[in-house]
Amino acid sequence: MKILFIMRNQAYVRNYESTIKDLANRGHDLKVVFNDYKDNDRLIERLNSEYQQINYSYEKIPDRCDEWSTLVKLIRALKDYLRYLYPEYIKAKKLRKRIEKHLGIIMVACLQGLRWLPKQLGVEPLTGLIEIIEKIIPEDKAIIRFLEQENPDLVLVTPLLDFDSVQTDYLKCANKLGIKCGLCVHSWDNLTSKGVIHVEPDRIFVWNKIQKQEAIDFHRISADKVIVTGAQCYDKWFERNTSTSLESFIERVGLEVGKNYLLYLCSSGFIAPQEFGFVQELLQQMRNAEHPQIRALGLLVRPHPQNAQQWDNIDLSAWNNTVIWPPGGQNPVTEESKANFYDSIYHSVAVVGVNTSAMIESGILGKPVYSILDPRFKDTQAGTLHFHHLVRGGLLQLSHSIEEYIQQLILRLEGKRDQEGEQIRQFIYEFVRPYGLDTPCTPILVKSIEAMADLPSVAVAPLPFWGVCLRVFLLPIALIVKESEYLYRKVEGKINQLFVEPLSRKLS
């Protein structure tokens, strides 16, 4: 098969490295293209040099810029916002504010009345209307031409669920051309923390039964289209072993030899933009603890690669046996960076953090994983749905204060929490490797992708007469919306400057 894999940027290659390699090894031709250019470790270039079947282009793929583009963005942003008015998202304040930025304060103000209406009278009818308009709006001609030129047998996209993602239009155009298309769900939080699926792909590949239910419940996808394959991106950690001894590792990173250490895993900028104050409080209580093992415990702070700049000018030398490593953060994509990541988890006595996917990887290595509920992060801990998967699944042990956490850690160091290991294994089985802890997920995903070749081709039904009439009616509206976007943003900016920002300053 000739496969076109559309990714947001190069950073997304990491989670599909094994998948791309396996597809190439099985004789498929792949071309990886990107919505945006992001200078990074250039993993795709290395894959291209190793496999002649793997090609790529850094040239930005066509965006939707036709007369319908502004209206399309508006209705999709509106539908994305509506999901955050459901009861499941009542605590998701920060997630809701993120999508509100795409709609603008004027539109958000107009929608506030929906909060007080039963969903059958407000959110659901409006969602249905948006879905009708989505079907009425034609495909983008530039994207159609691009797909015709590439002429793939199959289109894969990831992550799709970003707000204002052009990948939706690629699905829409692929459907029009009769090209089968699949969504590869990139991460554990994608189906609940971002936008919704606006155009239904032929297949959606998810990690586990939890994500499958999310696709059905939150995105209205037919169950037979959602395929559970496991988390292929974590296969490499099951196959790996440590590259160095504990003593050598501790000496290399700059901790005190002969003492154990705790690993603090930093989170993304959205989840925890500033963690230094929190880490400082943790250190203070560790160093002042009555228990000698806690006082002596080292702390390795591992910066998140997308939020490492917060540590650039931080000096922890005043705290003994504490390091920030690796400085500047590190994405585990090269052999060296993978070893660094693995070893930092492997040699630690336990892992703690706010809310990050590295907690799952720590569970794969059998490490106890902790999170301290803190008011600074309440909107990105309890205020997200995906955080609760780790708690309910048995991976994450919560505490409501640093003091409570230290007591948990004491029990761990004294060997009184032996039941943790079985809970962690059960979580990894259910969430990461649902076909068995010894069964790699990459071959399952690859075979599921290959099986799409046997799906029957379904022609897109032509618009009925009323649909054609509605399209004619909508076109001038689309043109007006496109022409008035600049004015709308200007007015919104003034309102923000004169009223919203001063009020926010007063409240803070």
Predicted features and spans:
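C-terminal amphipathic helix plus adjacent low-complexity
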Residues: 242, 266-270, 397-508
